[in-house]
Amino acid sequence: MSRRCQITGKGVLTGNNVSHANNKSRRRFLPNLQETSLLSDILGSAVRLRLSTNGIRTVEHNGGLDAFLLSTPNRKLPTEAQALKRRILRAKEKKAEATA
């Protein structure tokens, strides 16, 4: 399981710890990832994702998982999010066919 947000693509960064005496030692800056379940209205079920806390805020700010994915262009989404977006689009088309 990679340390990367499945919505925003935020991952591990590297840098230095710098002491008061200006000694440098390498370190890793890990993203604050949380395993969360987000409800998809179109799919009618909860989707488990590994998101950064910033990614959770972004999804909620944009009106939920479905609204966020449908309004975001594919070039800005990681591959996992693009696959989920395709699932949502297919389910939306099936619902449109069923009502028509």
Curated annotation (Swiss-Prot):
The reply to whether Ribosomal protein figures as a keyword in the UniProt entry is yes
Gene Ontology cellular component list? cytosolic large ribosomal subunit
Signal peptide bounds: none
Short name of one Pfam family: Ribosomal_L28
One example of the protein's molecular function in GO is: structural constituent of ribosome
| Stored Gene3D superfamilies | Ribosomal protein L28/L24 (2.30.170.40)
GO biological process per UniProt: translation
Keyword tags? Ribonucleoprotein, Ribosomal protein
Against InterPro entries, the record matches this protein to: Ribosomal_bL28, Ribosomal_bL28/bL31-like_sf, Ribosomal_bL28_bact-type, Ribosomal_bL28_sf
| PANTHER family (UniProt xref) | 39S RIBOSOMAL PROTEIN L28, MITOCHONDRIAL, LARGE RIBOSOMAL SUBUNIT PROTEIN BL28M
Per the record, the similarity remark reads: Belongs to the bacterial ribosomal protein bL28 family.
Question: What NCBIfam families does this protein's entry cite?
Answer: L28
Q: What is this protein called?
A: Large ribosomal subunit protein bL28
Q: Which organism is it from?
A: Gluconacetobacter diazotrophicus (strain ATCC 49037 / DSM 5601 / CCUG 37298 / CIP 103539 / LMG 7603 / PAl5)
The organism's lineage?
Bacteria, Pseudomonadati, Pseudomonadota, Alphaproteobacteria, Acetobacterales
Q: Name the gene for this chain.
A: rpmB
